[in-house]
């Protein structure tokens, strides 16, 4: 499976050039493929906030490279560069508050600085750590894909109809995807009849990004409006809903793109299995439950403007980016460390105590 997945890898969204970071501008896809160049931590923070780059793993990787750029700038300026670097950490941390991979990556970079040996070049050490974070995410994608395919096959070995939400592919990670990586692997193994893709309003990550990735891979796919999910489950024989995650708490609650919670409720009602796929860096054991997660909200203009024209300008807007799916609605959480079925606090603790695969 590993070799087949690597051979099928086509899309990259993050490229490190040593002195700058290039990000495939996801606001312009699929009509334009434009690379956005960042030469400072502030530029990367803006790119994260403005959705040039999105997806929890990709955000974390980008932030790691941003600290390399920041360290070089701070050291060149002289003075207490470590203290000054904390300003860059804070700037990056504030760019997307829900994605725990962002904070995980920043902590990994901080810890690397704390382990510096006498005479060791801090910038070189940080660069090596950022590259390691990037490469580790790719390896995690491979492991999750295999675990996810094994889970699908164990429940039903014939080609199946799957439903996914938002974008969890190569555009959202350092490899070829979390949930979409499992779907890609399932397709290579002959387990996919068709993938139904939620459009995912208001940024349309499903219709702009996931559909683009699936079509590029030759995976049979159908785009649907978000509100068709219940009808699809009832009429199209959906066997799995497969989604990613931006944060998973110690009890197995999952914060993900808005609309995920309602998919889980609908899946439970229709007897459809619900799988969450995310690296262990997405799991925040410091939070007991999803009630403690800070859920980002974005500007109301995202709902009030169509083709540059503003409608119902005076109405109040509620535009949350994420919601929380309770653990008791989830059949399985798939990570690079293994699979937790019917997650709870004890099972999540056992998972996180396992040795890392990379």
UniProtKB/Swiss-Prot annotation:
Query: Which processes are annotated in GO (biological process)?
Result: L-methionine salvage from methylthioadenosine
Catalytic site? 246
Keyword Cell cycle assigned to the entry: answer is: no
The cross-references to InterPro entries, in alphabetical order and at most eight, read: IF-2B-related, IF-M1Pi, IF_2B-like_C, Initiation_fac_2B_a/b/d, M1Pi_N, NagB/RpiA_transferase-like
**A Gene Ontology molecular function term of the record:** S-methyl-5-thioribose-1-phosphate isomerase activity
Record's keyword annotation contains Isomerase: yes
Could you say which residues bind substrate here?
54-56, 96, 205, 256-257
Locate the coiled-coil region(s) and give their ranges: none
Q: Name the catalysed reactions.
A: 5-(methylsulfanyl)-alpha-D-ribose 1-phosphate = 5-(methylsulfanyl)-D-ribulose 1-phosphate
A Pfam family of this chain: IF-2B
Pathway(s): Amino-acid biosynthesis; L-methionine biosynthesis via salvage pathway; L-methionine from S-methyl-5-thio-alpha-D-ribose 1-phosphate: step 1/6
EC number assigned by the record = 5.3.1.23
> Could you name the domain of life of the organism this protein comes from?
Bacteria
Q: Which UniProt keywords apply?
A: Amino-acid biosynthesis, Isomerase, Methionine biosynthesis
Q: Site described as Transition state stabilizer, positions? A: 166
PANTHER family documented for this protein: METHYLTHIORIBOSE-1-PHOSPHATE ISOMERASE
Report the sequence similarity comment from the record.
Answer: Belongs to the eIF-2B alpha/beta/delta subunits family. MtnA subfamily.
Annotated function: Catalyzes the interconversion of methylthioribose-1-phosphate (MTR-1-P) into methylthioribulose-1-phosphate (MTRu-1-P).
Question: Can you say what this protein is called?
Answer: Methylthioribose-1-phosphate isomerase
Q: Which organism is it from?
A: Stutzerimonas stutzeri (strain A1501)
């Amino acid at each position: 499976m590993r070799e087949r997945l690597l051979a099928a890898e086509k899309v990259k969204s993050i490229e490190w050039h040593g002195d700058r970071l290039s990000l495939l501008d996801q606001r312009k896809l699929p009509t334009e493929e434009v690379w956005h160049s960042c030469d400072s931590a502030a530029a990367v923070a803006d790119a994260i906030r403005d959705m040039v780059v999105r997806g929890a793993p990709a955000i974390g990787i980008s932030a790691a490279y941003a600290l390399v750029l920041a360290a070089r700038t701070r050291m060149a300026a002289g003075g207490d560069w470590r203290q000054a670097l904390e300003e860059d950490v804070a700037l990056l941390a504030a760019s997307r508050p829900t994605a725990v991979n962002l904070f995980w990556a920043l902590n990994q970079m901080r810890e690397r600085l704390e382990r510096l040996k006498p005479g060791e070049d801090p910038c070189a050490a940080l660069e090596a750590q950022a590259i390691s974070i990037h490469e580790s995410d790719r390896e995690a994608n491979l492991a999750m894909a295999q675990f996810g395919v094994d889970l699908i096959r164990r429940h039903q070995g014939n080609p199946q109809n799957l439903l996914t939400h938002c974008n969890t592919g190569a555009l959202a990670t350092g490899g070829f995807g979390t949930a979409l990586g499992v779907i890609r692997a399932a397709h290579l193994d002959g387990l996919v009849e068709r993938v139904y893709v939620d459009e995912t309003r208001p940024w349309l990550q499903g219709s702009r990004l996931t559909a683009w990735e699936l079509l590029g891979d030759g995976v049979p796919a159908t785009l649907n409006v978000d509100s068709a999910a219940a009808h699809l489950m009832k009429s199209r024989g959906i066997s799995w809903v497969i989604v990613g995650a931006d944060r998973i708490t110690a009890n197995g609650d999952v914060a993900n793109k808005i609309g995920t919670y309602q998919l889980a409720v609908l899946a439970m009602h229709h007897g459809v299995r619900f799988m969450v796929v995310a690296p262990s860096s997405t799991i925040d054991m410091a939070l007991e439950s999803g009630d403690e997660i800070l859920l980002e909200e974005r500007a109301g203009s995202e709902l009030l403007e169509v083709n540059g024209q503003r409608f119902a300008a005076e109405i109040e807007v509620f535009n949350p980016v994420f919601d929380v799916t309770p653990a008791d609605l989830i059949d399985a959480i798939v990570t690079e460390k293994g699979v937790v079925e019917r997650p709870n606090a004890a099972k999540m603790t056992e998972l996180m105590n396992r040795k890392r695969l990379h």
